[in-house]
Every structure is written in C-alpha cells, then in structure tokens.
Amino acid sequence: IEVPYLETLGPREIQLRGVIKAPLYSLRDFDKTTAEEWLTQRGHPGPWADFVSDKFMMQVPTSWIYAFDEPEELMNKWDLAMDGVSEYMGILPKDRNKEVLYLQPDLHIRHGSFGIGYPQINQLYEPNDDETGNSDHWMLEDPTHDYVEYHELGHAQLITMFPGEGEAIVNFPHAYVRNVKFGVDFETAFRES
C-alpha cells in the first residue's frame, strides 16, 4: 500500500484476516527490522520471504532463510549495488521513486530466456532441494555474482541509440558496480560483465 505522491499520511496499520505470515526483513528508512525481530520473522510459515529496502526488494523461498543470520549485511550490500546502478544511470539514489530492482526466483523461466520485469524472474530454483534454512544462493550472498540481473536492468533503463549497441551497453552497469562499489579491478569487472 503506497501513499499517493505529495501526501504526508505516513505509515498506517491495516488488519488482514485469514492470511499466513511470511518472513519479512525491512531496511526501509521508516521500518527497520531489528536483529531480535528477524529471529521471529524468519520462522513465519509463509512460503516466500520478503527482503526490502528503499532501493531493493526480493522474494526468496522461506526454505532458504529460516536459519539465515545476516539480513542487514546482505541488504546493505544490495543497497550499495543499487546506488552504483543509479550513479551509473545518472540518477541520484535519493531521487528514485521505487526500488531500483525487484528479484524473485522461479521454477521456470517463461519462453526459456531472460527478460526485464518487476519482479525480474531470471533465476531458477528447485523447491524440493533441502536448503537447511541457510542457502548459499548468490542472491543471499553476493549481489554482484550474476551479471544477468544487471544486464536486464540495463535493457529496462538505458536508452540505446546505435545499431548493435543494445546488447553491449547494458553490461556496463554490472561492471561499474563491481569496480566502483565493490572494488573488483576494472579489467576483471568488465570481462565478467
């Protein structure tokens, strides 16, 4: 539920019935989950866990996170990466009106190819795998591990002007984030993007 533009209503409480609570970790300016709250949140039985900040959002299977201990560190890394994307695009991070990127894995990728979207669903997962509640999936460890998400984000946000440019320039946000924000040397960041 979002408050309309220029309204100052702030957060509101709503009541829902007949729902199952899902784990939620929030690093939003107005709603930060504490470490103690996370210990309770991660045990909620909903099938998907939500991680959200002012710059990034993702949903992952609850089986990945019921023993996950580092949500704040993870979300700080994602925020740093999203700041890099915004900087590269020439947008001040504070001027974004929505999360820069929203990710979610799925069982099947439609049409067998990657694509842009909100959420971006470019990662597969196997629901029957025993993740022991502390998955080592890259989404929970290293926001720069997979270039695909940044490549598709580039398609969504960059305007290409020249023939052949479309599949090249979209790789630059990933190289920028890895080099400038995460300290990977430029040649490696560029080669792996």
Label the model's feature ranges.
Residues 1-45, 50:
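Extended acidic/polar, glycine-enriched regions
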Residues 37-40, 47-193:
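Catalytic cores of extracellular degradative/oxidative enzymes
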